[in-house]
């Protein structure tokens, strides 16, 4: 009955701060099973993010708000030559996704209200492996990639917030989402 079903385990503050040794056993057993079958996926949600159980292992999104939507789009890093161009593309991508929250036709009224409240964006990255290969790097976080990821984090929020302010819109509750 669970064939083709994604199973995800949510690790939250209650699990993190549990002094019981069963906590470690649970994690080890989950890892063992995931390495054997690919399930379960893990979701780590701690601190102020502990209620953001917004994804499973495939990054399929479910929100704690009924009828929520997320406007998604990705940047192909392998097509970008330098960090200045990347910064500009992140800015444009973020603004584009904000505009998409204004124009999309939605199925019913509640979705419009939740969208206005959350204005959830998911600016993603793809082509990271090819980007690394072009720089003769392994598939790992290099110092250069770390700088680019900082630009991605900072500029996506800055651009979306400033564009929302300019248009008198609510600011997004989320800005980025990267699929595996």
Where are these regions (language model features)?
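Glycine-rich ThDP/TPP pyrophosphate-binding loop and its adjacent helix/strand module
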Residues: 1-49
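Function-dense linear segments that define catalytic or interfacial modules
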Residues: 34-135
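Internal maturation/activation junctions in enzymes
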Residues: 2-21, 96-112, 116, 127, ...
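A general structural signal for short secondary-structure junctions and capping/turn motifs
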Residues: 25, 31-36, 50, 59-67, ...
């Amino acid at each position: 009955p669970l064939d083709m079903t994604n199973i995800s385990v949510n690790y939250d503050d209650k699990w993190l701060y549990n002094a019981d040794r069963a906590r470690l056993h649970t994690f080890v057993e989950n890892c063992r099973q995931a390495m054997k079958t690919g399930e379960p996926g893990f979701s780590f949600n701690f601190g102020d993010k502990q209620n953001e159980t917004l994804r499973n292992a495939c990054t399929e999104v479910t929100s704690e708000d009924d009828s929520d939507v997320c406007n998604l789009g990705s940047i192909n890093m392998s097509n970008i030559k330098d960090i200045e161009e990347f910064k500009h593309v992140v800015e444009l991508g973020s603004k584009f996704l904000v505009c998409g929250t204004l124009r999309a036709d939605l199925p019913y009224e509640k979705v419009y209200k939740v969208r206005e409240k959350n204005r959830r964006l998911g600016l993603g990255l793809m082509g990271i492996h090819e980007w690394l290969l072009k720089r003769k790097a392994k598939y790992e976080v290099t110092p250069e990639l770390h700088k680019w990821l900082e630009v991605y984090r900072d500029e996506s929020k800055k651009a979306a917030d400033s564009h929302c302010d300019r248009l008198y819109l609510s600011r997004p509750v989320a800005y980025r989402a990267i699929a595996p």
